Amino acid sequence: MLASGMLLENRLVERRSIIRLVEENFRDHFPSDQELPGLEFFPLGEDSWSYRCGPLWISVRRDLDGHFPGAYEVSLLLSESGKGYVLAPLPGRNGRVVHRIADFPVVVFPYVESATTPPAPPTQEQIDLLIARLGEVHAFEPPASRPVDVPTEDFRFPFENDLDKAVQAALNGDAAAGGPYAGLLAERVDRCQGFLAELREEATRVAGECAARWRGERPALTHGDPSLANVLFTKGVDIIDWGGAMWAPPERDWAALQRVFGTAPRSRPEFLRFYELRWHLAEIAEYATRFTGPHTGDADDDAMWERLTRYLPEPRGAS
């Protein structure tokens, strides 16, 4: 678990700023005569830096471009509608669910002990319960009195420009001075050009097919990444981290289940393939972008390079 997380604390967000946020918006979660406890940093999760402050779990999000506050707001509506398995964020005294520190989104949750321990593989019964609960989420309609701005699937690839820039920087040698993985990236991208081109061509074709078929269908409210990091398999099955919520075909969640657990409800193959391809290419774009910029070869870099090599494997016969 720790090997795949954000291992290093983000020093751009000062701890005193986080404590100030808690003091101003969440003081009522502590006894009035109690001094606020210090922050404890947890190296968990790839998309956030996480802290515990007594009964609170504080998530400083790093996904600035793909961040939609409405995704967290809709999880609060899900919880309030009786879906107790949705671990929703806590609204602050100012009424907001999403706060900002140093231009980073910050979301505060109740602290749950099981969210900080290494996950155990789920049983088939637990996976079946997860599927049933995701099905309930898919059918959810927010009340008209509380509209939320949740993005809708457009079958596009928002990372395409980043991927193009990273590939060109690697091939042109523009990133050679960025850090210890720049040269390795250039070699890997050069050998995998054909594989990457085929992957992108297939993704474009499948995206067009899915967009045409989905037109006119009722969208489902999807979580987007019901993985071991975001589902707590304890006595029940609780779903956390709703930052990627989106109106989309249900296969958006089923593809994630297939990728992580190797099983999913009966689904349309072309939609499953679209989400598989988009995930694959997004991972390549993210990690390639990291290694064409300044980096030091720290523990986070080591873990991300290992992941990149899984998504961009050496061609057969390469030496």
Curated annotation (Swiss-Prot):
Record pathway? Antibiotic biosynthesis; streptomycin biosynthesis
Q: Which Pfam families match?
A: APH
Keyword annotations for this protein, in alphabetical order, are: Antibiotic biosynthesis, Streptomycin biosynthesis
The alphabetized list of GO BP terms reads:
streptomycin biosynthetic process
Question: What is the protein's given name?
Answer: Protein StrN
Taxonomic source organism? Streptomyces griseus
